[in-house]
Amino acid sequence: MKPSGIVRWIALFLCLFICLASLASCGREPTDEASTAAVSGEEAAISESQKNAGGTGKLSLPYVKGDSLNPFTAKSLPNQMLSTVLYDSLYSVDATLSPQPLLAASGSVSGTQVRVALKSGLVFSDGSSLSASDVVYSFEKAAASPHYRAQLSNFSSAKVQSGNIIFTMKEVDPYALSCLDFAIIKRGSDSSETAIPVGSGRYSAVRGDSSVTLKANKSWLNGNTTKFASISLVDVPDSDSVIHSLEIGNVNFIFQDLSGGVYQRINANTTEFLMNNLVFLGIQSKNELLQNPKVLQAMSLALAREEIASSAYQGHAAASAVPFRPDWNALKGLSTAGVKQNKEAAIKLLQEAGFDKTGASGARTGGGKTLQFTLAVNKENPFRLSAANMIAAQLSAVGIKVTVTQLAWADYTKAVQGGSFDLYLGEVKLSNNMSLAPFFDEAGAAKAGINQEGAAAASYKQMLTGAVSLQDFLSTFQENPAFLPVCFRKGVAARSRDVQGDLISHSGDVYANLQDWHF
């Protein structure tokens, strides 16, 4: 081949090699430099988005637009939960229901009087002074409101005396400070039904043409270190859509109290905490068989409370054989009844009570009487219905024959209030001082079937006055139970995964550390 031909072949080969190399480079992964540039551009876009939203991103919380944000008239759960964000109180309660001073500088309980001194220099979010007269005004509003009425039912009045607030109670209560977590509003700022009262909380609410925005309160007493200058409130009108609103990103946080007896799995960061909702087995004290302390003790020992909490309530409850929340600070160091089932001990007690024979139905008999009862339950609550069936099976296993009567809510309420039951499965929300007034007060919501002259009722009243200790009452209650505690229910707080910082929620404040959240 001539030299010129060789040169042409070499040139053709070089052209082909260059083309192939170029094609190969088109399908190659981008270089590290290219990836870094892309990420930097994305971060810049996020940074700009955050800047537009006040420097920290846009946080959205649920509320019900058709409901009020007034802490004394709000009916919906989301709006009630926002109360601790918009309004401070004299005291807040921590995760163990221990009262922590917020607006209060000090507080003391003496007999039927509670004396509270305010911190100095307190101001509302509008810059006006917060005084003792605002506290008295708020107390009177709270005591008449559905949300706070029960927890303040033992308080008869409040007045200003030498700059302090003096509360007068109807009965002695050593744990009264835990009840003083009602919202404090500026006197007269709730003059209209649509008004959002002025508060002193971490945020204030600003109403726009068609929306409500929360603005950080720069005058907050603890120094506002919140990462969000503003928070959007998003209308979530019904409880069925609240989980969906979180999962699609419309809101960043929700709270569910599971009062309907159903749990739906949530795709988010979640935390659960004990609420004050006590599930209990009500007892008709007029039934002669249920007046026998050994029968009642046996029933308590026969209950597998942990199994009920984990199975019937799907883990959203904590077993308790005492009528107080297991994590209540006042119980620390005390001896409390165990929650473990003990069928052998239960059977022994029944035999000691004279029920040493077993009939054809499996029920124990003695002295011509049979341990056979009905158990009323609201069939519309799946958690409670499942618990009732488990309780019936557990009691029947030791010879206490129980037949579950499933009733619609209206019929169930009528039966309980009318005393037409042997046993009933109920639930009551205790106030933060763990008052058992719902059971032992003549106007109590859970007084049905209880002997108000019985040993447990008498011991409880003595405990409040200091005549006997809390430990003494627990011992008396275990020996002579007026009702059988089963468990305390839990609530579920859920937050979108893009929000960072610890998620601290408890029964006193589901937004306990809102100021620490960030994107």
Give short role names for the model-derived ranges:
Residues 495-519:
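Long beta-strand-rich cores associated with HINT superfamily self-processing modules
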Residues 108, 113, 150-190:
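Surface-exposed binding/hinge segments that line
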Residues 291-390:
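Append "and occasionally in soluble cytosolic enzymes with long acidic Gly/Pro-rich linkers
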Residues 403-412, 437-499, 519:
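Extracytoplasmic/peripheral linker and loop segments enriched in polar/acidic and small residues
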Residues 219-262, 401:
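Ligand-site clamp/hinge motif
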Residues 357-430:
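Ligand/substrate-recognition segments at binding pockets and active sites
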Residues 178-232, 238-241, 343-344, 348:
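Gly/Pro-rich hinge or "lid" segments in bacterial periplasmic/extracellular proteins
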Residues 61-109, 117, 140:
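N-terminal lobe/hinge region of extracytoplasmic solute-binding protein
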